[in-house]
Amino acid sequence: MSTKKERLDAICGIIQTKVISNQEELLKELEDSGFSVTQATLSRDIKQLKVAKVHDGNGDYVYRLPEESISKQAQPEGKKKPNIEFSGNLAVVKTRPGYAMGIASDIDSHAPSEILATIAGDDTILVIPRNGVSQEKVIAALSHFI
């Protein structure tokens, strides 16, 4: 019997090394690696890992891990710079293609007190702060998600 951490590590490894375009393919790869997983469990794991389906440039969509999961150890904590720009009190966050909706959903579900709402496209998030919240506080609130 494998632990959840082992299964999550296996999912990350498979997504990083193989072209996976749906849960069925990922389930098969996990089974080939010795993991017995239901589709419901896999779906929860994918959500927990914040796996996104992104366009691969060939007309297909494939699973990708968020950039922070892949390069978290490679980038020292002090060197992280989110790509956030402001227009008045509105913040615009640029992400990798396909990641904006997942990140915006994460922000909305955690509901930081500084953020009123988000609107997401494919690679851009419009962040609407609450009245009177400074840009510095918005950046601090968003830094937990990007």
From Swiss-Prot:
Q: Which controlled-vocabulary keywords does the entry list?
A: Amino-acid biosynthesis, Arginine biosynthesis, Cytoplasm, DNA-binding, Repressor, Transcription, Transcription regulation
Q: This protein's superkingdom? A: Bacteria
The principal location of this protein is: cytoplasm
Task: Look up the record and name the pathway of this protein.
Answer: Amino-acid biosynthesis; L-arginine biosynthesis [regulation]
One GO biological-process annotation of the entry reads:
protein complex oligomerization
Q: Which GO terms describe its cellular component?
A: cytoplasm
GO molecular function terms listed in the Swiss-Prot or TrEMBL record = arginine binding; DNA binding; DNA-binding transcription factor activity
- Compartment(s) where it occurs, according to its Swiss-Prot or TrEMBL record: Cytoplasm
Q: Which SUPFAM superfamilies does this chain map to? A: C-terminal domain of arginine repressor (SSF55252), Winged helix' DNA-binding domain (SSF46785)
UniProt keyword S-adenosyl-L-methionine, yes or no: no
Please give the HAMAP family that the UniProt record associates with this protein. Arg_repressor (MF_00173)
The entry sums up its family as follows: Belongs to the ArgR family.
Function field? Regulates arginine biosynthesis genes.
- Enumerate the PANTHER family for this protein: ARGININE REPRESSOR (PTHR34471:SF1)
Protein name per Swiss-Prot or TrEMBL: Arginine repressor
* Species the sequence originates in: Parabacteroides distasonis (strain ATCC 8503 / DSM 20701 / CIP 104284 / JCM 5825 / NCTC 11152)
Its lineage reads:
Bacteria, Pseudomonadati, Bacteroidota, Bacteroidia, Bacteroidales
Q: What gene, per UniProt, encodes this protein?
A: argR
